[in-house]
Swiss-Prot record:
Catalytic function, reaction form: (2S)-2-hydroxy-3-oxobutyl phosphate + 5-amino-6-(D-ribitylamino)uracil = 6,7-dimethyl-8-(1-D-ribityl)lumazine + phosphate + 2 H2O + H(+)
Organism for this UniProt entry: Xanthobacter autotrophicus (strain ATCC BAA-1158 / Py2)
A biological-process GO annotation: riboflavin biosynthetic process
Lineage: Bacteria, Pseudomonadati, Pseudomonadota, Alphaproteobacteria, Hyphomicrobiales
One Pfam short name: DMRL_synthase
Residues that bind 5-amino-6-(D-ribitylamino)uracil: 30, 61-63, 90-92, 123
Single Gene Ontology MF annotation: 6,7-dimethyl-8-ribityllumazine synthase activity
Disulfide bond sites: none
Annotated InterPro entries: LS (IPR034964), LS/RS (IPR002180), LS/RS_sf (IPR036467)
Pathway: Cofactor biosynthesis; riboflavin biosynthesis; riboflavin from 2-hydroxy-3-oxobutyl phosphate and 5-amino-6-(D-ribitylamino)uracil: step 1/2
Binding site for (2S)-2-hydroxy-3-oxobutyl phosphate: 95-96, 137
UniProt protein name: 6,7-dimethyl-8-ribityllumazine synthase
Active site per UniProt: 98
Enzyme class, UniProt record, top EC level: transferase
Length: 165
C-alpha cells in the first residue's frame, strides 16, 4: 500500500532534525519581479523551519549552480558549513536555442552540485514558455515554486540527518 501526505516545513514536528541548519539560496535575478516572488516563497518556508538563511544574488539562472559551488568551497575554507542549497530563477522560452541551453545546464548544474557534495538541493529555477506561466508558478499565492524548492531541500536535509544519526 502506498500512502502520500503533504507536509509543510512550518509544522513544528517537521522541523525536528533541522536544528542549527544553514541553507543557502542562490537566486538568478534576470526577471526581477519574478525573482522577488520566488525568494519570498523560499524565505517564508525556510524561516518557518527556523533555519539560518543566506542569499546570494547572480544575474541569471545559468550562474546559479556556479555561484553555489563557489559558496560551498568558501564555506569549507571558512568552516561555515552549508547544509542545503536552494536555486531560484526563471528561464522563459524565446525564439532561439538559448532557452534549451540555459534550462538544461542550470538544472544539470544543480543536480551535479547535489551529487558531487551529497548535498540537499532544491531546484526552483522555472523553465516556462511564457511570462504568464512564470507568474502562475512563482506567486506565493498560487504555485509557490520558490517555497516548493525550499521544502524539497529541507526534506532532503531531514532525510540526510535521520540516516546519519
Amino acid at each position: 500500500m502506498v500512502t502520500t501526505r503533504k507536509e509543510s516545513a512550518g509544522d513544528a514536528s517537521l522541523n525536528a532534525g533541522l536544528e542549527g541548519a544553514r541553507v543557502l539560496i542562490v537566486e538568478g535575478r534576470y526577471y526581477e519581479a519574478l525573482a522577488d516572488e520566488l525568494l519570498a516563497g523560499a524565505r517564508a518556508v525556510l524561516e518557518a523551519a527556523g533555519v539560518e538563511v543566506e542569499v546570494i544574488t547572480v544575474p541569471g539562472a545559468l550562474e546559479v549552480p556556479i555561484a553555489a559551488e563557489i559558496a560551498l568551497e568558501a564555506a569549507e575554507i571558512t568552516g561555515n558549513a552549508v547544509d542545503a542549497v536552494v536555486g531560484l530563477g526563471v528561464v522563459i522560452r524565446g525564439e532561439t536555442y538559448h532557452f534549451e541551453i540555459v534550462a538544461g545546464e542550470s538544472a544539470r548544474g544543480l543536480m551535479d552540485l547535489g551529487m558531487a557534495h551529497a548535498l540537499p538541493v532544491g531546484n526552483g529555477i522555472l523553465t516556462v514558455d511564457t511570462e504568464a506561466q512564470a507568474w502562475e508558478r512563482a506567486r506565493v499565492s498560487e504555485g509557490n515554486k520558490g517555497g516548493g524548492a525550499a521544502e524539497a531541500a529541507l526534506t532532503l536535509l531531514r532525510l540526510r540527518r535521520r540516516l546519519e544519526a
